[in-house]
Curated annotation (Swiss-Prot):
It catalyses: Hydrolysis of (1->3)-beta-D-glucosidic linkages in (1->3)-beta-D-glucans. This is Probable circularly permuted 1,3-beta-glucanase. GO terms for biological process: cell wall organization. Residues 100-112, 177-186 have a biased composition (Basic and acidic residues). Belongs to the PGA52 family. Its main location: secreted.
Length: 440
């Protein structure tokens, strides 16, 4: 959704001829054809550069050229998840494809990382308590939550309470602001067969469970130690936030509703320590995104109508959205006053999964944002899910295709592993499909 209020019309206009021939309609500068259940994106530019921010000081930002490569271009790098209300978030999961030879934790280091030592693996060789450990045992890839810290055994933690998701109070573990929450509850090893997809993150607001995630907002630009000149900054959510609270273990929503116009950001639970993320904004909270070229995002959500209207384009009411950003964007500035303080303008990548472009509209568009000549979005749309549905976003490196599918039935539970057959079903056409080829 980043900047799409400004550039959405331009992208739609670029396909105006095709849309007109297909009998589609221009509504408010955006082209709409008909509703579909599946949109595929192919033809990504597989190599290129963007301007990676390397300094933020004195109201100015510096950058250097960063090279990327892979089936999905810059979207093959770490991504952050962004949700805008009105929305009910019931559950969310992220998966990476397993390997028969060794666990595929990350892609090989980028050229920038090789030059500057910002390798994710280098800074995470020692597993801390609460970290997920992956190993090969008897030829099988297994993972578990590390409970051994090298010293005395940790004291047992109590299981999460079970209040209803709409109850106003939740049990506090003392977390507030940037303090570290308790470690998540342990669970046993998970066998991952070669070719299967392993769950690396989960949010379940019904069970009040979360693993492998951090919840943030972009309101940290006014915190102590954060330079206000650069605009919005990441801040981890705490007890003082108006629509999220804390439970025993990791933080989780006390209510599944994201209020109208509010934004929620979800990143991994791995903080950017020791320069493992490269440069991040001084004073702001910083976490790794969800990496790997092959990845799946599943969302169980509803986008109810509110009938409200914002005072300006900067106040998007009754316009829910789900989008993915290159994690380098929010780690510096998602909405910068100076565009050089974000890599967005130079093409580091955004994918709008489902976005309502006008207040109260019942149509959701999807769009890929990178360098303008390589950007694009389908003129076909998804029906706004006023009732709960599952949304699947599949980055399949085997065929270089990104699949976005809405499922009104099935896949309402997100298991620890997905088989290749499960993923085929997620990517299968049910008859209402649009295949969009990018101009790579």
């Amino acid at each position: 959704m980043h900047y799409s209020l400004f550039f959405g019309a331009a992208l739609a206009a670029s396909v105006s001829t095709v849309s007109a021939e297909a009998g589609c309609n221009n509504d408010g500068g955006n082209w709409y054809c008909s509703a579909v259940d599946l949109i595929t994106y192919s033809g990504f530019s597989t190599s290129g550069t963007y301007d990676l921010v390397t300094s933020m000081s004195g109201g100015k930002c510096g950058s250097e050229k960063h090279e990327y490569s892979g089936a999905f271009g810059p979207l093959g790098e770490e991504l952050s998840i962004h949700l805008r209300g009105p929305m009910q978030l019931f559950s969310m999961a992220v998966y990476n494809r397993g390997s028969g030879e060794k666990p595929k934790r990350e892609l090989k280091p980028s050229i920038h990382e090789r030059r500057h030592g910002h390798s994710h693996q280098r800074f995470h060789e020692k597993r801390a308590v609460g970290d997920k450990v992956v190993a090969i045992i008897d030829g099988q890839v297994v993972s578990w939550i590390n409970e051994y810290a090298g010293g005395a055994p940790a004291a047992p933690t109590s299981a999460p309470g079970a209040p209803g998701i709409n109850e106003p109070q939740v049990k506090s573990n003392g977390y507030k602001g940037g303090d570290k929450p308790k470690d998540p509850k342990p669970h046993g090893p998970v066998n991952v067969a070669p070719g299967d997809w392993r769950r690396v993150a989960l949010v379940d607001t019904d069970k009040q469970e979360a693993e492998g995630v951090s919840f943030l907002n972009n309101n940290g630009g006014w915190d102590k130690g954060v330079d206000q000149a650069f605009g919005a900054a990441l801040k981890r959510l705490g007890l003082d936030d108006d629509f999220f609270g804390m439970g025993d273990g990791p933080n989780f929503p006390k209510d599944p509703t994201i209020p109208d116009g509010k934004e929620l950001i979800i990143m991994s639970d791995k903080s950017c320590e020791g320069g493992s993320c490269g440069f991040t904004r001084p004073g702001a909270d910083a976490f790794h995104g969800f990496g790997g070229e092959d990845k799946i995002f599943l969302f169980r959500v509803a986008m109810p109508l509110t009938g409200t209207r914002g005072s300006s384009i900067y106040d998007p009411k009754d316009m829910p959205a789900i989008w993915l950003l290159n994690a380098n964007i929010p780690r510096t500035s998602q909405y910068p006053m100076d565009p050089t303080c974000s890599c967005w303008k130079s093409g580091c990548g955004e994918f709008d999964v489902l976005e309502v472009l006008a207040p109260g509209d019942k149509r959701c568009k999807s769009t890929y944002h990178t360098k303008q000549e390589l950007s694009g979005g389908s003129s076909y749309y998804f029906d706004r899910p006023e009732e709960p549905i599952t949304i699947a976003v599949v980055f399949n490196g085997d065929d270089g295709t990104l699949y976005v599918k809405t499922l009104k039935e099935g896949f309402d539970k997100f298991p620890e592993t997905l088989s290749p057959e499960d993923v085929k079903k997620l990517c299968a056409s049910d008859g209402k499909t649009n295949n969009f080829a990018l101009a790579s």
